């Protein structure tokens, strides 16, 4: 069923119909389209287009259709309707006859689809926020269980300073918290209803659009009809949120892929999130994490594609905007799946503490402590930095960690070094000294865990 046709003397070419139709993807807006139609039927009563009895009939039929859709959304794809709006209207007419043809009075598919998509975005943000919280909680639990797991921290993928697996876990809690905040901000901006904006110039009926917005659960109605039907900022914002969120998940995945590798050996992933090789029986591949890392590109591609689609469009609605949905649906589905998978990866992960400790003791990660020790003895930092560099070269030559150099060896580089240097060079001392807010000291990490738990309640 097409919602247009009187102007045309020839039927559309079948190839054009297939090219033009959007039901194969916008069927996902069925529930939102029906909910919007119920609200619109109520608005039509207020302006005398529908009687109260007619509205009750329409609402009952629409609610029945909503239940049918929830039971079997795939039924929609069996239709040859042009789009979800055509499908819903056709089904409504099947149920109530000619009365169903009155529902579209004063409404355009332009404001209708804009409303549907915003309602869908609001629902999906709720799902994303829940999945984000689930992963944050999994990371906090991982941190709680691994406060004593000392490991090397890296810069340039070289061992830099000792940290703990708990501190590493909490770093990703911070990233996810920012993702959560961005989603909440986006929700505030998109929480305005375009319904009643018509095709572009507003509806010809004096509908109370603020009341209509309230019925649909929006905070308010939009202020300009031209902008209302052509605004896709919320699509761009959500794709941007997803792109940033997937960058965080990709980095999370990359870290764990490395930690799980034979070269690092810091963790072992559960069998539930790994796979084997068809040829090499010894392999246990981190496929879940590699897929998270790989899917980042498709999400960022959706953002780039949507920006290119919108950049040259004049006001108001253009058919180009039909391209807003497939990329958005796929990107947010992907982000949601990856958030769930990230939590699953952490469920059952084993941290190999002895190996983490061994790696932390290698790579001269306590070099900064020796420099700070020299500064405390009155040596200018830049000079101390140079002295420690020379000491590291000597330790490498001898094949020893810094703390195993003799006092005589260390005093070759600075006479101020005494026996009191050795406690300073221990891993525990390295951690304990980072006691400022946000640092890796056990006290600060414990406080960060407590703060995160309090925020996530």
Curated annotation (Swiss-Prot):
Belongs to the lyase 1 family. Argininosuccinate lyase subfamily. Keywords: Amino-acid biosynthesis, Arginine biosynthesis, Cytoplasm, Lyase. One of its GO terms (cellular component) is cytosol. Its EC number is 4.3.2.1. It comes from the Bacteria. It is found in: Cytoplasm. This is Argininosuccinate lyase.
